[in-house]
Amino acid sequence: MTVTPRPTADLVDEIGPDVRSCDLQLRQYGGRTDFAGPITTVRCFQDNALLKSVLSEPGDGGVLVIDGDGSVHTALVGDVIAELGRSNGWSGLIINGAVRDASTLRTLDIGIKALGTNPRKSTKTGEGIRDEAVEFGGVVFTPGDIAYSDDDGIVVIAAG
């Protein structure tokens, strides 16, 4: 399902005080700064095998929300995994964790927001949970809801 990005500030003005807006000050790393789409979730801690598997599937314009428990000890996404997501049609990644290969990520046509960078690789044991609600930044990210992201922040709208 393709969702057209909209300015998050406009969405906040339309929705009002009950808006689901992420409080975390995530930084832009991808080459696409405005992105939107249905949410798929992964919860993992310093291990990126599951999220790599998810990004290997057709994204259909979706947004993968990755809850890495706020760890910046290892990077969950680098250039290879980001390119995998881009080539499979994912609109963007929202990462409560770190990325690496930041200079290359900026050249890829995929949205990527994360807490920061660390060149250290994560483990690849496959531990983690997929397609369950995750919460960070004061927002519950529920699979199927719609995420909108731009330079101002992230807003989540209930599906339907």
Swiss-Prot record:
A divalent metal cation binds at residue 101. It catalyses: 4-hydroxy-4-methyl-2-oxoglutarate = 2 pyruvate; oxaloacetate + H(+) = pyruvate + CO2. GO terms for molecular function: 4-hydroxy-4-methyl-2-oxoglutarate aldolase activity; metal ion binding; oxaloacetate decarboxylase activity; ribonuclease inhibitor activity. Transmembrane segments: none annotated. InterPro entries: RraA (IPR010203), RraA/RraA-like (IPR005493), RraA/RraA-like_sf (IPR036704). GO terms for biological process: regulation of RNA metabolic process. It comes from the Bacteria. Keywords: Lyase, Metal-binding. Substrate binds at residues 78-81, 100. Its EC number is 4.1.3.17, 4.1.1.112. The keyword Metal-binding applies. Its cofactor is a divalent metal cation. Divalent metal cation. Belongs to the class II aldolase/RraA-like family. Catalyzes the aldol cleavage of 4-hydroxy-4-methyl-2-oxoglutarate (HMG) into 2 molecules of pyruvate. Also contains a secondary oxaloacetate (OAA) decarboxylase activity due to the common pyruvate enolate transition state formed following C-C bond cleavage in the retro-aldol and decarboxylation reactions. Homotrimer. This is Putative 4-hydroxy-4-methyl-2-oxoglutarate aldolase. It comes from Mycolicibacterium vanbaalenii (strain DSM 7251 / JCM 13017 / BCRC 16820 / KCTC 9966 / NRRL B-24157 / PYR-1) (Mycobacterium vanbaalenii). The lineage of its organism: Bacteria, Bacillati, Actinomycetota, Actinomycetes, Mycobacteriales.
